[in-house]
Amino acid sequence: MRVVMCILIISFTVIFGMSCERHMEQQVSYTEADSLNHLAYDMRYKDLSVAMKAAKRACQLAEGNSDLRAEALNNMGFCAFMRMDFEKASSLYLQALKEGGNEIEHLISDVGMMKICQRTSMNKEFYDYRNSALQRLKRIREDEALISDTHEKQRLNYAVSEFHIVSGIYFYYLEQHDESLRSINSITPDVLQGDTAQWLYYEYMRGSGGMYEAPTREEITIGE
């Protein structure tokens, strides 16, 4: 009986140790995936190849973590969009929408699909994804006070700024100038604080897209 008990104890100890080791390895992978997601985002306007490579690796390492995978897929979708591979970008954003229940990442996916629909003249689908994004944003705002993670806040600010920029551009090309200005002016400076690349993108689109407002024509020209 004692021999059996000893065998059981040893077996349990070995199994428990292996389980702990696997858990630790998984956590190391998730930490690396998180760092790679940050790198992919930071490099998105500097080097698309580096950004895509980092996002792909993050997606692999994030197996079992839907939040990290959704973020990686969104980063990959952005890179594909920038390369004008709209079919690939669409596939990645739609895949991200199926990952878990992270409303912030799903909001980013919706906005990514809005950009694709705008570029491919899919007007009905644009409004479908825009309405979905508005509903998500409403739900997020209801619980926004509970968001304490700095990275989550940054992702939300990115999503919100992208939503208003994309909407502003869309309405501008439809010659709905009041709606376009209303959308672009919804972006407040604090939303882009700490995200230089996104702030520059916002300023560029605002100026080049004719979404700058000022009292006189001369001031508008200077501002743009």
Regions found by a protein language model. Give the residues of each.
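Residue register of alpha-helical TPR repeats
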Residues: Q27, D34-S35, E71, I108-D110, ...
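Amphipathic alpha-helical segments of tetratricopeptide repeats
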Residues: K56-Q60, L94-K98, N131-D149, L181-L192, ...
